[in-house]
């Protein structure tokens, strides 16, 4: 199962009709990984503060606060997966062998 993770991104690009040859150059931007990780976690923490502690309820005109909290935690799990998979994926692949 872990070996199929390498094929997900090309399959998604194929479905949307986008070439993935530009992904070869992304290794040059590895130095930006940690700062962008910090920025995304700070933005998510700010969203948590707005959702849980803010007096003014934001984005609640069409959806209840309870649904927003459930959606927040679902997105949090997905975000943590995408932020950590470059670190965890080699470990998972090593366990599979």
Curated annotation (Swiss-Prot):
Q: Which UniProt keywords apply?
A: Cell membrane, Membrane, Transmembrane, Transmembrane helix
Instruction: Work out whether the entry's keyword set contains Transmembrane.
Output: yes
Q: Name one GO cellular component term.
A: plasma membrane
The places in or outside the cell where this protein is found are: Cell membrane
Residues annotated as transmembrane? 7-27, 34-54, 69-89
Membrane topology, as annotated: Multi-pass membrane protein
What top-level branch of life does the organism fall under? Bacteria
Signal peptide start-end: none
Principal location listed in the UniProt entry: membrane
Indicate whether Membrane appears among the record's keywords.
yes
Q: What is this protein called?
A: Uncharacterized protein HI_1049
